[in-house]
Amino acid sequence: MFSDKPLITDDEAAKITRVEELAYELTVGEVMTNKVCYLRPEQTMREALDEFKKYRISGAPVAVDGNLRGILSIEDLIRSLRDGRIDLTVADYMTSNVITAKKEDQVIEALKLFVKSHIGRLPVLDSENKLVGILTKGDITNGLLQALQNDFEAEELIRYRASHLFEDIVSDRSTL
C-alpha cells in the first residue's frame, strides 16, 4: 500500500535543490573560519592539550610562519596520553601528510574531501600555500544556512518592492 502523499512537497524539493546549488556556488573562503588557532611543531603535547581546552577545539593545524607543517587531532593527544608521553612535541604526534582545501575551491569539493577522507577539519590555504583558515562541516552548514537566509531576505525585498510598485501604479491611475 503506497500513499498518494508525496515524500516531500514541491516547495521542499526546491529548497533542497537550492542547497545543492549553493554547494557549487559558494567557495571555501566564504564559509571557512578565518581566525585559526594553530600550533607550532616545537610545542609540547601538554601545551597543545591546554590550547584545545582553552579554545574548545578538537584539532588544529601546525604551522610555522603561515606555512602548514601538519595537523594535530584530539586522537593524537589521547595517543600521547596513553603512551605516557605528554611532554613530547607536537611534531612527534602530528599528521604531516595533510589534506587541505584552497580558499577558491567550491564547497562541494570540500564536502567530497570530508566524505572520502573521514576527516574533521580541513586547513585552508591561499594561492601562495599559506594557511588562511580552517574549514569544518559545521562551517559549511552555517555558510549554507546564511546563504539561504540571504536568499530569503532578497526574495522578501523583491516582493515588498513589487507590491509597492503595484500600489503606486494603482494610485496613479486613480488620480488620472
Tell me what each language-model feature is.
Residues 1-176:
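Tandem CBS (Cystathionine beta-synthase) repeat/Bateman regulatory domains
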